[in-house]
Amino acid sequence: MAMPTNPSSNISFLLLFLLLHFHLGKSELEVNYYSKSCPKAEDIIKQQVTQLYNKHGNTAVSWVRNLFHDCMVKSCDASLLLETVPNGVVSEKTSSRSFGMRNFKYVNTIKAAVEQECPSTVSCADIVALSARDGIALLGGPSIEMKTGRRDSKESYVTEVEDSIPNHNDSISLVLSRFQAIAIDVEATVALLGAHSVGRVHCVNLVKRLYPTVDKTLDPTHAEYLKRRCPTPNPDPKAVMYSRNDLKTPMIIDNNYYKNILQHKGLLSVDEQLATDPRTAPYVQKMANDNEYFHQQFSRAILLLSETNPISGDQGEIRKDCRYLNAN
């Protein structure tokens, strides 16, 4: 005679299965993933990033931005790096959100060096992640132990870029919701925006705060400086007209960004909102007061970002050329 089934036992078994499945999926990323398949991989990437930084310091900033733009859209899967091809992929780089991004050609330089050592082994997604890690360290930021084992996407997500990556004119509520969608909490979001301590903002992205009248929340003296940097309300997008995010330490990831926005010297409207919104202001104040705390939270935030929904296991592929899908 068949034994009666216990509904609660079935539910418990299902929950156990789901928990194990989730755990196994998350564990496919690991520290030193290439220790056996390509033991020199991380050293080669670090060496290439350092050499490029010594020649072109702004490359380190590009690697940090690449990580953000890649991971915010679906997954940390190097979909950002794909080039447009006729009747095929449309590059995410064609989106207006990618305006001002550069140095992609040097990703190919890093990839070529790794391929020479270990062909078809190290993913472009891991190169994006590790180059950001090494770039952060070169820019005076924290040293971060990062997991690897990501695989590369077989498609571009250009239609999802606009809905995934916050715009400089977005409200702080929308920005927080975009990060929350990928499980990045408020404190980590405030820390990630500290990446604005390096690099620059193009005039096309800040003139709305200057013309026809100056944004009342902007420090008047700083506004005059910005108007000298951006003397027209209609700058040519192709012209390299910009202002540094941080005038004091423009190429160091430090807490000066938070000190600046507390003085109403942030370049973007989201910077001003970050300093004044009650959900974020306490973290801004704390980071402005304590650079070590900022670095700790920045490290945590970068890890959360870099481990967003990775493609791993037997999914995706390991691209031979980061710009194009592998030929079938």
Enumerate the predicted regions with their spans.
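Catalytic cores of secreted/periplasmic or lumenal enzymes
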Residues: 2-328
